[in-house]
Every structure is written in C-alpha cells, then in structure tokens.
Amino acid sequence: YYKVPFSLEGVELDGSGLPTGIFRRNANYVLRSNVLRSLPDEFRMEAIHLAMSRLLENGITTVAAIEGGWLFDDRDAEFIYAHSGEFPVDMPLFYQTMDLAKVWKLGLRRVGGNIMVDGTLSSHSAALSAPYADRPDYRGQIFLPQDGLDEFVQQCYRQDMQLALYSIGDRAIESVLLAHERAIRQ
C-alpha cells in the first residue's frame, strides 16, 4: 500500500485539483517510506549480494551503510543490523536517528549520515550566509536549532559515538563546527 493522501503537503496538483504524480517534501517522505517498508527481506538480500559482488570485483572491502531515519525507513537499518555478519564486505551501520538510546542499545557506536542540519541548494533550503542569487530575500534554513544540535553532539561525545551530520550551506557548517567545539570543551 503506497497511497499518500492528496491533502498531504507536497502532493503536486494540476489545475483541476488532481494529483500530477509528483511528490515533494512530506508527501515524498511518506511515499518513500511506504515503498521501502513494503519490500520483502529477500529483495533486500538479493540487492546486497549484487552490490557485494560488484564491490569485491573492484577491490572495495568496506562500505558505510547509512540507513534508517525519517527520510527513509528504519527497516533497512534493522535489516543491515540483523545480517551484518553475513556479508563478505565490512559494512559499518550509521543509523540515521537522533535516538541515541536506541543506537546504544543495539551496541552501535556510530550515528548519522542524513541527520540534516540544513537542506539542499536546489530546494533553496541550504542555510547560506548570503542570499540565494535567484532569491535575494532568502538565505535557506537551519533545521536543527543550535542548542539542540549542541546537546546532540555533546551526547555523542559523552558516549564516544562517531557522528556524521548533513550540512551543505556555510551557516549550517558553521553551526556544526560550533557544536563540535562546544562538545570538545565539555
């Protein structure tokens, strides 16, 4: 079942109010999660085995699995976690969640990937210090406020967890660096 309510933010409608089939923002996240949740584990394993043979053919012995979280679905992270010992390539799991207790309980020592501090340049949501050239009234958006980011990074440091954050714009990068500087001083 992939259906997304037409009233959900991000469902593009045509002039007569009917969906065009283009899903953005929340509608895209809901649709993607519905699709990913519906995939059987056999399909996941088959896809991983195909990727593994290609990786090994090219001499690649480690690949980071950046899985789960609100942009995708936790099912892939859970699958990688459950089957990690079965792969011929080392696949450290970066669980894309800010729920450190959940990650810690699984015995994982890394978190992140698409934990988004800001957005993308193409959507004008990357947080810039100067306005966008084609939108002089807008500088993008910080998704994680500094105090929340500081606390999250400090928790990762206290628990000795490796952390990967998504930051594109220079304001977001500055915010991440500041959070790391503050965590180091704690």
Report the location of each language-model feature.
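Acidic/histidine-enriched ion/cofactor-binding microenvironments in catalytic or ligand-binding pockets
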Residues: W104-K105
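Divalent metal-binding segments
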Residues: Y1-A101, L121-A172, R185-Q186
